[in-house]
Design a protein with these regions (language model features):
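Short, basic, glycine/proline-bearing loop/turn elements
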Residues: 2, 69-75, 103-106
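A short, well-structured juxtamembrane/interface segment
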Residues: 3-24
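Catalytic core of membrane glycerolipid acyltransferases/transacylases, capturing the structured
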Residues: 7, 22-79
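A generic structural signal for alpha->beta connector loops
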Residues: 9-11, 48, 68, 95, ...
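Structural motif corresponding to alpha-helix initiation and N-cap regions
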Residues: 14-17, 59, 82-85
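Residue-level "edge-of-site" marker
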Residues: 18, 79, 137
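Non-catalytic C-terminal accessory region of glycerolipid acyltransferases
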Residues: 83-186
C-alpha cells in the first residue's frame, strides 16, 4: 500500500526492474539521497525486501513499524555490526532480498557519492548471491518528472578481492549517476 501511494505521489520512472530475480537471495546496493529511497527500491519488485537502516529508527516512536517490516538495525557509530551482519546473512541464506546503501548515510554533499563501506560486497561474497547495483536520480517532488531508479545488471565480483569488489560497485553506481547528469565520471 505504501508503495502504491509513493508511486502515485512521486510518479517515478523505474528502469531495469527485471534485473531483480523473482526468487533466490539478492543483495541490492545503491546511492542514498532521501529517506524514501528504500520505499522506491521496494516498488521495483513484488518480493519483500529487508533493509539495513540506522538503529535510531528502531529506537524511535515508529520502531515497531521498522521491526515489523524486517528492517535490520545498524549502529552507524560502531566499527563493526556483528548482530546486523548475522541477521542479514540469515535473510540471504533463507533466499531473501537485502537492500543497503554502501554510503551508510544520506548524501547531502556536492560529491556524487560518499565513500562506500564494505557490507554489500561482503554479504554478496559470503553468500555467493547476486550483487545488484541501482542508482536513484532526480527530485522527490509531487508528481516529479525526473525521479528515476535504474536497476543495473548484477556485477560479477567472484574473482575480485573485497577492496576490488567495493571499487567495482562504487564505479558502477557512480557511472550511472554521472551518465544521468550528463557528465563524465572523474
Amino acid at each position: 500500500m505504501l508503495g502504491t501511494i509513493f508511486v502515485w505521489w512521486y510518479n517515478p520512472t523505474i528502469i531495469g526492474k527485471e534485473q531483480i530475480p523473482h526468487e533466490g537471495a539478492v543483495v541490492l546496493a545503491g546511492n542514498h539521497k532521501h529517506a524514501f529511497d528504500p520505499i522506491f527500491v521496494g516498488v521495483c519488485t513484488k518480493r519483500p525486501i529487508h533493509i539495513l537502516a540506522k538503529k535510531e529508527l528502531h529506537d524511535s516512536v515508529f520502531g515497531w513499524f521498522f521491526r515489523l517490516t524486517g528492517t535490520i538495525a545498524v549502529d552507524l557509530e560502531a566499527e563493526r555490526n556483528p548482530k546486523a551482519f548475522a541477521e542479514a546473512l540469515t535473510y540471504l541464506n533463507d533466499g531473501n532480498v537485502v537492500n543497503l546503501s554502501p554510503e551508510a548515510e544520506r548524501n547531502y554533499t556536492e560529491h556524487i557519492l560518499l565513500p562506500f563501506k564494505f557490507g554489500a560486497v561482503v554479504l554478496a561474497k559470503r553468500t555467493g548471491c547476486p550483487l545488484i547495483p541501482y542508482a536513484i536520480t532526480g527530485d522527490y517532488r509531487f508528481r516529479s518528472r525526473n525521479l528515476k531508479i535504474t536497476v543495473l545488471p548484477p556485477i560479477d565480483i567472484s574473482d575480485l578481492s573485497i577492496d576490488q569488489s567495493n571499487e567495482k560497485l562504487f564505479d558502477t553506481i557512480k557511472g550511472q549517476l554521472c551518465a544521468a547528469q550528463g557528465r563524465e565520471p572523474s
